[in-house]
Amino acid sequence: VLVDGDLTYDPVVAPMMLECLIKDKLEMLNIARIGAKGSYRKGHRLGNFLLTKTVKIIFGSGLDDMLSGYRIFTRRFVKTFPSKSDGFEIETELTVHSLEMKIPIGESSAKYEERPHGSVSKLSTFRDGINILLLIIRLFFLVKPITSFSLVSAFLAITSIINGWLQVIKPWIDNDEITKYPSVIMSSSLMVLAIFM
C-alpha cells in the first residue's frame, strides 16, 4: 500500500481496496480522490486534469486521477517497477509503467480530506507540474519512439515546406530571383533533419 503521509487520505478503506485488488486480479489499484470542499486546490485540480488527459491521449490510460497518492500494488508489480523519480513524478511513472507492461490495473475512489491545520503542502503547482510534463514527454520518446520521432519528423518537414514556399519558392516564381539565402539554408536543414529523424 502506497499512501501520502499527510492525513488527507482515508486509511480505513485500505483493507476493502486490497480485497478489490485481489478479487479483480489487478496488479495495481489507483484510489481516486473525492475531495471535500477546500481539500483540493483549483490549480492542482486543473493540473491533474490536464496531465491525466495528456497521459490518456499518449499512452491510453484508463485512470481519472493519475496523480493520486493512494495506490495498492501486488508484490510482482513492485518488483518490476524501475523507480527513477524522487519527486511528485512518481505517480506518473507508476501509471505509464503499468500501461507499458499492459498489466491489469483498476481505479476506485475514496474521500480526500483537507490537510490538518498548520501542515503545508510540499507540492509546487507550476514547478512540479512542469517536471511531470517533462517526464511524460521523456517517457513518450522512450516508450513510443516510432510515434514520437515520426511526429517530430512530420513537424520539421511541414515547417520546412511552409518556410520554403513562402520565403524561397514563391518569391523566386514572382521575381525570378532568390533573395533570402538564410531561408534556403533553414528550409533545407529542416528537411534533412526531418528525413534523418
Report each predicted region and the residues it spans.
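Hydrophobic helical membrane-anchoring modules
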Residues: 85, 92-197
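Short beta-strands and strand-loop turn motifs
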Residues: 2, 30-33, 107-110
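Glycine-/small-residue-rich active-site loops that bind phosphorylated ligands and cofactors
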Residues: 9, 35-38, 140, 157
